[in-house]
Each structure stands twice: as C-alpha cells, then as structure tokens.
Amino acid sequence: MKLSAEDKHNVKTTWDHIKGHEEALGAEALFRMFTSLPATRTYFPAKDLSEGSSFLHSHGKKVMGALSNAVAHIDDIDAALCKLSDKHAQDLMVDPANFPKLAHNILVVMGIHLKAHLTYPVHCSVDKFLDVVGHVLTSKYR
C-alpha cells in the first residue's frame, strides 16, 4: 500500500501533536493491547505489564520513537526501519499478527488524546501509515 501526498501530510501534521508525548501514549497503547489481548504478553513473560509500569513506559517510548523515525523518513520507511525489521524477524521472532493489534491500540489512544485532530481523513491516513509500517516490519519474515 502506498501513501499518497495527502496521507503523508496528514501523518506528519498529526505526529506533530504526538511529539513530547511518545512515552505516555506508547505506554497506554501497549497497556491496552496487553490487557485486551492477553496472548500478546507472551513476549514479555518476566516484565511488569501493569498500568504505569516503568517497562511499559520504556517500551512505549521505543515503539513510538520508531514510529516517529518512520514519520521523519516517510518517503523511505523501508530504509528507516530496516534494522528494526531484522530484529523483530530474526532475533525476537514476534508473531506478525501482533503488529495490526498494536496499530489498532495506537489508533485508539490517538483517538482519545487527539480527537480534535483525528478527523476521518486523518484517521484513514494514520491507519494506512501504521499498515505500511507493519508491512515493513514483517517483510523480513520467512
């Protein structure tokens, strides 16, 4: 799926509202995913996945930081996420089915906190962007 010029604009503009809040929004999205979809917890058996935990904040910051990097390199997301794609496929072996689940929860959190900015066209653009990111992250799976 290709992002149109309008999609790229919508994503960049929306991401400006996320800057400075990556850690909190990422932690909330992860908490929602782990709570509503317990099977996604399997990759973190010894971690504290409770709401507000330092692990959720740390990992949420990493997740949203990677997405911020993808936004900053929106014209070449493949290159921007190449190393992360390798890591998820070869080292972590994360089930590719989990990426859309996390994307959904990121959109939910964005809808809660950015409702004035997440209009229907923007929502569609961000959804497409997260789908592209998920595709890139699973492109190295065999």
Swiss-Prot record:
Cysteine-cysteine disulfides: none
InterPro entries named among the record's database cross-references: Globin (IPR000971), Globin-like_sf (IPR009050), Globin/Proto (IPR012292), Hemoglobin_a-typ (IPR002338), Hemoglobin_oxygen_transport (IPR050056)
Sequence positions that bind heme b: H88
CDD domains for the chain: Hb-alpha-like (cd08927)
Keywords assigned: Heme, Iron, Metal-binding, Oxygen transport, Transport
Domain Globin: 2-142
PROSITE patterns: GLOBIN (PS01033)
UniProt keyword Cytoplasm present: no
Expression tissues: Red blood cells.
Molecular-function annotations in GO: haptoglobin binding; heme binding; metal ion binding; organic acid binding; oxygen binding; oxygen carrier activity; peroxidase activity
Ligand binding (O2): H59
SUPFAM superfamilies: Globin-like
Gene Ontology cellular component list: blood microparticle; haptoglobin-hemoglobin complex; hemoglobin complex
A single BP term in Gene Ontology: hydrogen peroxide catabolic process
Quaternary structure annotation from Swiss-Prot or TrEMBL: Heterotetramer of two alpha chains and two beta chains.
Function: Involved in oxygen transport from the lung to the various peripheral tissues.
Stated family: Belongs to the globin family.
Protein name in the entry: Hemoglobin subunit alpha
